[in-house]
Amino acid sequence: MRIFAGIIFTACCHLLRAFTITAPKDLYVVEYGSNVTMECRFPVERELDLLALVVYWEKEDEQVIQFVAGEEDLKPQHSNFRGRASLPKDQLLKGNAALQITDVKLQDAGVYCCIISYGGADYKRITLKVNAPYRKINQRISVDPATSEHELICQAEGYPEAEVIWTNSDHQPVSGKRSVTTSRTEGMLLNVTSSLRVNATANDVFYCTFWRSQPGQNHTAELIIPELPATHPPQNRTHWVLLGSILLFLIVVSTVLLFLRKQVRMLDVEKCGVEDTSSKNRNDTQFEET
């Protein structure tokens, strides 16, 4: 803020009270990941002399934009705003030192100071708030086989913290065992997971609502208890598997028996052939002796 103090001191010394800058809005509320343009207007009587214009945008102790000698000086710019903050020159020519920030982060929230020197000096403070609605709600339903209870789970990311409210199809609060866990993402968003254990039947409807006090910031997901899968198909499959195993066993046994029977027959034939040969040899011997 040394620059700010120097400009104000210069203005006071020269008593240039006629130079006044205006801010159409002193509060901007934007969504995480969106773009924002914060306006800071100053008087331009004739054609703007860019070389005589000095503009500073600061956020607390962080340098956001520095415009001197007719161009932006990025050297002192804080790393948090590198590549995301700019001061459109076409707006400067209209007397509007508009600060544009793209892909707004949670850490961008805070109080900004617009300081302008152009024949005189003045400043304005502008507040930026960042919200991240819990729009994308992931859900899951599971059944505890031991207790037959259904566990309903809703998970979403956002900022600031939201309360998770569970209701039934009549939008009445639901009693049951609940738990909530909260963690931080890399982008500093809050990762909120809420679970509810209830006794329910198929087609029962439940709602989980990520509730915040601001209007239009509430988001709801619907969970419908699914029907239990039919038990017949698994039993039928078991029967078919068992029957197939039995048939395969019988085929293998039959094949083995046929093979063994064939081997026995071949042995019998070979045995008969040997016996016939032996008998013939004996008969030939007896004939020779005679």
Curated annotation (Swiss-Prot):
<dbReference type="InterPro" id="IPR013162">
    <property type="entry name" value="CD80_C2-set"/>
</dbReference>
<keyword id="KW-1133">Transmembrane helix</keyword>
<dbReference type="GO" id="GO:0031295">
    <property type="term" value="P:T cell costimulation"/>
</dbReference>
<dbReference type="GO" id="GO:0035666">
    <property type="term" value="P:TRIF-dependent toll-like receptor signaling pathway"/>
</dbReference>
<protein>
    <recommendedName>
        <fullName>Programmed cell death 1 ligand 1</fullName>
    </recommendedName>
</protein>
<comment type="function">
    <text>The PDCD1-mediated inhibitory pathway is exploited by tumors to attenuate anti-tumor immunity and escape destruction by the immune system, thereby facilitating tumor survival. The interaction with PDCD1/PD-1 inhibits cytotoxic T lymphocytes (CTLs) effector function. The blockage of the PDCD1-mediated pathway results in the reversal of the exhausted T-cell phenotype and the normalization of the anti-tumor response, providing a rationale for cancer immunotherapy.</text>
</comment>
<dbReference type="InterPro" id="IPR013783">
    <property type="entry name" value="Ig-like_fold"/>
</dbReference>
<keyword id="KW-0967">Endosome</keyword>
<keyword id="KW-0832">Ubl conjugation</keyword>
<feature type="glycosylation site" description="N-linked (GlcNAc...) asparagine">
    <location>
        <position position="191"/>
    </location>
</feature>
<dbReference type="GO" id="GO:0015629">
    <property type="term" value="C:actin cytoskeleton"/>
</dbReference>
<feature type="topological domain" description="Extracellular">
    <location>
        <begin position="19"/>
        <end position="239"/>
    </location>
</feature>
<dbReference type="InterPro" id="IPR007110">
    <property type="entry name" value="Ig-like_dom"/>
</dbReference>
<dbReference type="GO" id="GO:0070062">
    <property type="term" value="C:extracellular exosome"/>
</dbReference>
<dbReference type="InterPro" id="IPR036179">
    <property type="entry name" value="Ig-like_dom_sf"/>
</dbReference>
<feature type="topological domain" description="Cytoplasmic">
    <location>
        <begin position="261"/>
        <end position="290"/>
    </location>
</feature>
<dbReference type="GO" id="GO:0032733">
    <property type="term" value="P:positive regulation of interleukin-10 production"/>
</dbReference>
<feature type="signal peptide">
    <location>
        <begin position="1"/>
        <end position="18"/>
    </location>
</feature>
<keyword id="KW-0675">Receptor</keyword>
<dbReference type="GO" id="GO:0009897">
    <property type="term" value="C:external side of plasma membrane"/>
</dbReference>
<dbReference type="GO" id="GO:0046007">
    <property type="term" value="P:negative regulation of activated T cell proliferation"/>
</dbReference>
<dbReference type="GO" id="GO:2001186">
    <property type="term" value="P:negative regulation of CD8-positive, alpha-beta T cell activation"/>
</dbReference>
<keyword id="KW-0393">Immunoglobulin domain</keyword>
<feature type="domain" description="Ig-like V-type">
    <location>
        <begin position="19"/>
        <end position="127"/>
    </location>
</feature>
<dbReference type="GO" id="GO:1905404">
    <property type="term" value="P:positive regulation of activated CD8-positive, alpha-beta T cell apoptotic process"/>
</dbReference>
<dbReference type="GO" id="GO:0048018">
    <property type="term" value="F:receptor ligand activity"/>
</dbReference>
<keyword id="KW-0677">Repeat</keyword>
<dbReference type="InterPro" id="IPR013106">
    <property type="entry name" value="Ig_V-set"/>
</dbReference>
<dbReference type="GO" id="GO:0042130">
    <property type="term" value="P:negative regulation of T cell proliferation"/>
</dbReference>
<keyword id="KW-0732">Signal</keyword>
<comment type="similarity">
    <text>Belongs to the immunoglobulin superfamily. BTN/MOG family.</text>
</comment>
<dbReference type="GO" id="GO:0002250">
    <property type="term" value="P:adaptive immune response"/>
</dbReference>
<keyword id="KW-1003">Cell membrane</keyword>
<keyword id="KW-0472">Membrane</keyword>
<feature type="glycosylation site" description="N-linked (GlcNAc...) asparagine">
    <location>
        <position position="218"/>
    </location>
</feature>
<comment type="function">
    <text>Plays a critical role in induction and maintenance of immune tolerance to self. As a ligand for the inhibitory receptor PDCD1/PD-1, modulates the activation threshold of T-cells and limits T-cell effector response. Through a yet unknown activating receptor, may costimulate T-cell subsets that predominantly produce interleukin-10 (IL10).</text>
</comment>
<dbReference type="Pfam" id="PF07686">
    <property type="entry name" value="V-set"/>
</dbReference>
<dbReference type="GO" id="GO:1903556">
    <property type="term" value="P:negative regulation of tumor necrosis factor superfamily cytokine production"/>
</dbReference>
<dbReference type="InterPro" id="IPR003599">
    <property type="entry name" value="Ig_sub"/>
</dbReference>
<dbReference type="GO" id="GO:0005654">
    <property type="term" value="C:nucleoplasm"/>
</dbReference>
<dbReference type="GO" id="GO:0031901">
    <property type="term" value="C:early endosome membrane"/>
</dbReference>
<dbReference type="GO" id="GO:0002841">
    <property type="term" value="P:negative regulation of T cell mediated immune response to tumor cell"/>
</dbReference>
